[in-house]
């Protein structure tokens, strides 16, 4: 794999990570707790899900989806259901994690990591990204070193991007403003998650 091919891969992964969606909403939700550890756990668990997709892309993800279209539909429906579940909870929330922290009910790092991992592994958008845009790079790699680099690139790009988002969102000045509007943010993220769930259902039906 030449440097130019790797840079193309890096650019595609960065643009994919930067695109707004439910992943950012979940990282934002957990960073609002005031604990960077929660946000970082969400970010790197999300990146772990990205790494899983990168790994199975090496094993022929696009071919699997082509031969087993019901598998992609199953992932899409599961992802839509999970987004709807998160959206419903956000709409009912009275301040989300920030409220729980103020009441003394700390949100565990495991819970943050679990939501981060599930939001990536159950995302049909991410599945399609790897099947359509990532898989073509598989033909350009050979040997363990290049294959390791191919899996590590999207994992690190995603993890570092959401680490940056966590650090920005958990800065004291911004965090104070966000916590004042935690209920509004929860409502907006809830609506966005529900609309994304509906969009996924309509696109695969």
PLM region spans:
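Juxtamembrane transmembrane-helix termini in multi-pass membrane transport proteins
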Residues: 3-73, 129-154, 163, 167
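Alpha-helical membrane-protein architecture signal
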Residues: 7, 11, 106-118, 148-149
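Membrane helix-loop-helix hairpins that form the core translocation module of multi-pass transporters
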Residues: 37-112, 198
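Select subsegments of transmembrane alpha-helices in polytopic membrane proteins
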Residues: 45-52, 113-126, 186-189
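Hydrophobic alpha-helical transmembrane segments in multi-pass integral membrane proteins
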Residues: 54-58, 122-127, 131, 189-205
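Selective transmembrane alpha-helices of multi-pass membrane proteins
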Residues: 67-98, 153, 157-165, 176-205
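Short, flexible, glycine-rich and Lys/Arg-enriched loop motifs at helix boundaries
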Residues: 170-175
